[in-house]
Design a protein with these regions (language model features):
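GST-like fold's C-terminal all-alpha helical module
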Residues: 102-191
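GST-like domain detector, emphasizing the conserved glutathione-binding G-site
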Residues: 1-132, 153, 178
Length: 191
């Protein structure tokens, strides 16, 4: 059986999701660190133009998109499952919501002054001279990826983010995982 090779970078939340799932399923894997921003000539050549992170390589096969990667890993190692039998559809719906709505609300906060200082400077109080250029370069790169995508204005995104975090907290009331006694793809996506 071919090795699992995860192409990723350390600070990517979608990469972290897949790294955690690989650990949860106790799958051996190899790591290839890729650039955060363009140009990524090796990545684009290998993926046929896909530039997002992460992607999974198994032999000559390349799997792009973390939702697809979850399905591939589930097929390769069915236990422990990411999709509890009685909640498979719900797990997928919550994971998709987290990957889309929760993620973009969180990103709006990450590009606020305190969020960017934390993300690029290591502390919400880091001076802008320490992180400003990195944040601008990263933000410009991500803007090219988001062309045509609807975005919430920053104040609306902050309100939505707080609301989403309250909902997740409510779901965790009295239990350790979002959908019950064991982790599911929903937990890894919301993490």
């Amino acid at each position: 059986m071919s090795d699992l090779i995860l192409h990723h970078y350390p600070s990517s939340p979608f990469s972290e999701k897949i790294r955690l799932i690989l650990g949860y399923k106790q799958l051996a894997w190899k790591s290839v660190i890729i650039p955060q921003i363009m140009p990524k000539p090796d990545v684009v050549a290998l993926t046929g133009g896909y530039r997002k992170t992460p992607f999974l390589q198994i032999g000559a096969d390349i799997y792009c998109d973390s939702a697809l990667i979850c399905d591939v890993l589930e097929h390769r190692q069915p236990t422990p499952t990411l999709y509890p039998k009685d909640q498979k559809g719900l797990a997928r719906i919550v994971a998709q919501w987290a990957d889309e709505k929760l993620f973009w609300a969180a990103m709006a906060w990450n590009f606020s002054p305190k969020g960017a200082a934390q993300m690029f400077g290591g502390s919400p109080d880091a001076p802008v001279e320490q992180w400003g250029l990195k944040a601008k370069v990263f933000g410009d790169d991500r803007a090219k990826m988001r062309v045509g995508m609807a975005r919430l204005p920053a104040p609306d995104a902050a309100t939505a983010y707080r609301s989403y975090l309250r909902r997740l907290s409510d779901m965790l009331e009295g239990q350790s995982f979002l959908l019950g006694a064991a982790p599911s793809v929903a937990d890894f996506s919301a993490y």
